[in-house]
């Protein structure tokens, strides 16, 4: 694994949580832009972005919605913009790719395997749902699979990677996903040093336990030697403990309201709250935080002047 400064990624809104869970979850384009810009000002070098319907907050893959906030963020910040290709588990591959192909960003996420992606346990907490789609979407994950076949992964690598010069945040939800990434690397479809996001705590993926982080890193070391970089995200209350451990092990970190709605014991009032908290932890550990340009150099990105927005 290549050592360097710690990259802070902020996942601003995602498609996991719903508006009824927090009044601070951004879903209108102007709010997503404002939250992203504030997170960058707080120290995030990479902004991971989904889009939501401006009327009711449901996840959307509509490129027109993305284009209502992407240029605003770019004009106000030099942070790396990373667009999802995961979208949500109920979207088709073409829907999930539409915005990224239109925007040709520096980075995109790329999920490394099909899996159960259970959000339905969040139904167990009584709520006054603001919109009918919210419990319906959560319940749908009980019987659906988040599809990321070998053919899907190869198509994304070729269409976005080879076609647009986009680099990837390879999202690995379990050990087998590391072997899938190695498979595509060995076939020549993953040039350069891969940037892996170890994802912990999603129901259907690997649990958010320290032993699992050690195991994931050990397998990555075996498969990639020192030619990789890794970051960690953890869902919910395990967010800060797991990413702090990752940083101490030489990795980078991801925060944001996509992954956890909390800052300490209370609801986070903004994405920037979480960025400031992890930045303070990193600085307390005498770890240097990467600037956007340092992150670009570490990850071999094409630069913000070569995107289509």
Task: Enumerate the predicted regions with their spans.
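Glycine-rich, proline-tolerant flexible connector loops at the mouths of alpha/beta enzymes
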Residues: 20, 45-67, 199-204, 261-265
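Active-site beta->alpha loop and helix N-cap motifs at the rims of alpha/beta catalytic domains
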Residues: 60-147
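N-terminal small/glycine-rich loop or linker at the start of catalytic domains
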Residues: 1-24, 127-133
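Active-site mouth loops of central-metabolism enzymes
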Residues: 14-31, 85-93, 142-147, 169, ...
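Structured C-terminal cap/extension of enzyme domains
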Residues: 179, 218-222, 241-309
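Alpha-helix-loop-beta-strand connector modules within alpha/beta enzyme cores
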Residues: 10, 58-83, 156-159, 216-225, ...
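Conserved, mostly hydrophobic/aromatic
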Residues: 32, 39, 50, 108, ...
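Catalytic alpha/beta core domains of metabolic enzymes, predominantly
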Residues: 107-256, 268
